[in-house]
Swiss-Prot record:
This is Large ribosomal subunit protein bL32. The keyword Ribonucleoprotein applies. GO terms for cellular component: large ribosomal subunit. It comes from Nitrobacter hamburgensis (strain DSM 10229 / NCIMB 13809 / X14). It holds the Pfam family Ribosomal_L32p.
């Protein structure tokens, strides 16, 4: 069975775990509606994506 040759140092362990951190999702303000939305996602309220109408806008009821 394979065994580690040396003990993993705290520095190396920390560098390995640095990619596991959870970051807050970023938001961009929509130019038309002023609402916050995720970058590279369509705005569900207006149905727009990159200036094009992709979905029908949600009707207010």
């Amino acid at each position: 069975m394979a065994v580690p040759r040396r003990k993993t140092s705290p520095s190396r362990r920390g560098m390995r775990r640095s990619a596991d951190a959870i970051s807050k999702p970023t938001y961009a303000e929509d130019k038309d509606s002023g609402e916050l939305r995720r970058p590279h996602h369509l705005d569900l309220k207006t149905g727009m994506y990159k200036g094009r109408q992709v979905l029908k806008a949600k009707s207010e009821s």
